[in-house]
Each structure stands twice: as C-alpha cells, then as structure tokens.
Design a protein with these regions (language model features):
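Positively charged n-region of N-terminal signal peptides that target proteins for export
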Residues: 1-4
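Bacterial N-terminal signal peptides
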Residues: 7-16
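C-terminal and late-domain segments of enzyme folds
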Residues: 21-51, 62-69, 75-79, 157-159, ...
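ATP/NTP phosphate-donor binding region
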Residues: 45, 53-103
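A short, aliphatic-rich alpha-helical micro-motif
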Residues: 104-105, 137
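Catalytic nucleophile loop
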Residues: 112-114, 133-157
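Glycine/threonine-rich flexible loop motifs
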Residues: 117-127
C-alpha cells in the first residue's frame, strides 16, 4: 500500500529546531469526537480569555456549509461568547487571504471542527493561515478541535486509510500533521470505533512517539508544561513502546506482522493526568488536594 508519509527524519529535525526556541505558551483542548464535553468547551473559552475573547472557528475539515455557523452558534448560545468569527477556509488558495490570516493571528482561541483531517493539511499546512495559527499558539492562544480537528494536531497524522483489522508494518497511512501536540500520535473516536489496531501498528514502528487515543465525548487538555488532563465521559488510552522489544514475521498473503513485548498501555479516566516528558501517570487533581 502506498503511504503518503514525509520522511520521519524531517519531522524529527523540525521538532528539534522548534524545541531549540521557547516552548509554545498555548494550551490544547482536543476532543475525541461525538458530543463535545461541556467542561472541555468551557475550559477552551476560559483559556482563550473568557466569553469576550476573540475566537476563530475553522470548519476546513467539514464538507457541510452548516458546520462553521453551527459551531459559532454553540459558542454564542451555550458559552456566552461575543466575538466568534468563522474562517471558512476550504481550499489552499484561501489560506493566503489577508483577512483570514489577520483573523487567525488575532484570535485567542482557534477551534478546528471535525470531518476529514486530510482536508485541513492540504488547505493549511505551510501557508500564511497555518503559520498564523502556529504563531498565535506559540504566543499563548488556545487551540481546540474535535474528531478530525484533533487528529491533525500531532507531528504525524493518521489519515484514516489502511487495513485496521490487522496489526502490521507499513499498514497505516501517515501524513505530516500540524505538530502542535508534540511527541505523540493522536487518534480520536478511539474506544467507540475500536481503533487500537492502527494505533498499536503505528507506535510499534515509531516508539519515540506516544500513542494517545481519545474516545468520544472526552478531551485531553494539554498544558504548556507538557502534561495533560482528561476531561469528559470516557477514556483516554496512552500506548508507550519506548521499552518494547519489537518483533516482525511474515503475514499470510504478504505483508509483515509486527509484534511487541513489554508494550505499556494506560487507560485514563476523567481527572487523571499524564506527564508526556517522563511518560508517567500523575496523581489526579483530586488526589493532590
């Protein structure tokens, strides 16, 4: 199967260059699809600066014209936001629009709607609009997303193409993502859509990265100190292959099976926290009071 994967060495080099400067000051609030947890959306608005803060909605991943206006309406009606702008980027050429770029650069909260994550990357990566989001995030803006708007946030992004009934090498199509959620590969709808096969396949081939599977109705709140907290109704799964012995064997009908010994998996619930730098579970906020 053809894999549209940028060289991993390029991704790691880019991450190293980014890491050489000051780390981003922004937070991430990333939802795994399904219903958007009220607590997660309120946290997004709070981190943006409150209901009066400028918020930009990017419906780029969606094929529906209603997605952007509906998300704007939710921010206004449910969370009292008064300065919400839909930035309707659908084509790459629109990412060069000066008005759109100015709106994104001035936003304190930027929210990516769901749909097809490949559309976000095609339209925005390496453009003035994409750069404006990155600059705003580095300066302290909160970036949020749901479903595809979550999947696009890691340095490598699962596109959704592949045979997910097996755990095999070279089986999952990856693209370079936006790279705001560093050190991981994030996968939404994780428990609801039984996506463990594809995330395990990817992490066994990229043990330097953590797999973070975010279930529906659930979010991760990623902080500038490289920790995250679980918000919502279900689970967040962390897959860690740093100490795993990876094995390979021929697969029936071609291909290559991939296996691992001592693969570490954490199943986290609401309120539990994780340190991405040390790859360890932290006490829940309620346990430290």
């Amino acid at each position: 199967m053809r894999r549209l994967l940028f060289a991993v060495t390029v991704v790691l080099l880019a991450a190293a260059v980014a890491g050489a400067g000051e780390p981003p000051k922004g937070h991430l609030v990333l939802i795994g699809g399904g219903d958007k947890p009220d607590a997660a959306m309120r946290k997004f608005v709070e981190l943006a600066g409150g209901p009066g803060a400028p918020i930009a909605v990017l419906p780029t991943a969606s094929s529906s014209k209603k997605t952007g206006p509906n998300q704007k309406k939710q921010f206004e009606k449910e969370f009292g936001c008064t300065d919400v702008t839909v930035v309707p980027i659908k084509e790459r050429a629109q990412s060069f629009d000066e008005g759109f770029v100015k709106t994104l650069a001035g936003a304190r909260g930027i929210f990516f709607s769901g749909g097809d994550q490949a559309l976000i990357i095609r339209a925005m990566r390496g453009t003035p609009a994409g750069d404006a989001v990155a600059t705003a995030f580095a300066a302290g803006a909160v970036v949020g997303g749901t479903s595809a708007g979550t999947a696009c946030q890691s340095p490598l992004m699962i596109t959704g193409n592949g045979n997910f009934k097996v755990i095999e090498a070279n089986n999952v199509e990856l693209w370079e993502g936006l790279g705001f959620f560093t050190g991981v590969i994030v996968d939404p709808h994780f428990v609801a859509r039984q996506r463990q096969n594809r995330l395990i396949s990817v992490i066994l081939e990229h043990p330097d990265l953590l797999g973070v599977g975010v279930d529906e109705d659930t979010a991760v709140w990623v902080k500038p100190d490289r920790t995250f907290e679980v918000i919502g109704a279900s689970n967040v799964i962390v897959v860690d292959a740093a100490a795993t012995t990876v094995r390979r064997a021929p697969a029936a009908g071609g291909g290559e099976l991939i296996g691992g010994r001592d693969l570490k998996v954490h199943v986290l619930l609401a309120g539990e926290r994780f340190d991405l730098a040390s790859r360890t579970v932290m006490p829940a906020a309620s346990e430290t009071r």
